[in-house]
């Protein structure tokens, strides 16, 4: 059993497919059929999975793992998340303006005045576009669009992302940038 130091979620296993031990999986890679190209996949409980075969299907990939030889074994994997070590991702293949979503986690979101809006705690794709989750001390998590309008610059080395708080939906107007929390409705004094 191997514990990963810096795990990166690569796929989630779904239902069994057929009788030979294949499973349906949602891959979180740019090329879903490349899931096995990063080495062995690991579950958080320490199991290791080797991809033997992989093919595309509608919205998922069909995967056969070594040692999973029948439907019962495949059904037991339903819902399992599979990870690799961050170091297994090929940094040398990235362009200067490319990065892995996992590298965004922990970056501080600030505007052009230096106002902090929280730290990126996750990147999600619910189908209508990617979202960044920001968490701040004493604040509830918020989701902002991961778009060119909302995220103006990504500085991995500096540990920051520059955001436009209006485009991100964090404020309603530039007047909201006073640095003070908004007043509750009905309790304003002029």
UniProtKB/Swiss-Prot annotation:
Write out the biased-composition intervals (Pro residues).
Answer: 181-190
Q: Where is the PRC barrel domain?
A: 95-177
Primary location class = cytoplasm
Q: Where located?
A: Cytoplasm
Domain remark text: The PRC barrel domain binds ribosomal protein uS19.
- Family that this chain belongs to: Belongs to the RimM family.
Identification of the protein by name: Ribosome maturation factor RimM
């Amino acid at each position: 059993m191997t514990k990963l130091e810096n795990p990166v979620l690569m796929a989630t296993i779904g239902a069994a497919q057929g009788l030979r031990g294949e499973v349906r999986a949602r891959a979180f890679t740019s090329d879903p059929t490349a899931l096995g190209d990063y080495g062995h996949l690991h579950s958080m409980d320490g199991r290791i999975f080797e991809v033997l075969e992989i093919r595309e299907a509608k919205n998922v990939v069909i995967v056969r793992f070594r040692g999973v030889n029948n439907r019962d074994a495949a059904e037991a994997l339903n819902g399992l998340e599979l990870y690799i070590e961050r170091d297994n991702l090929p940094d040398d293949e990235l362009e200067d303006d490319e990065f892995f979503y996992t590298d965004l986690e922990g970056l501080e979101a600030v505007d052009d005045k230096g106002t902090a809006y929280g730290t990126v705690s996750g990147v999600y794709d619910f189908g209508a576009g990617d979202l960044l989750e920001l968490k701040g001390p004493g604040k509830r998590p918020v989701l902002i669009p991961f778009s060119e309008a909302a995220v103006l610059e990504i500085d991995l080395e500096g540990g920051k992302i520059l955001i436009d708080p209006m485009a991100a939906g964090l404020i309603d107007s530039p007047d909201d940038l006073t640095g003070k929390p908004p007043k509750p409705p009905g309790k304003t004094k002029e």
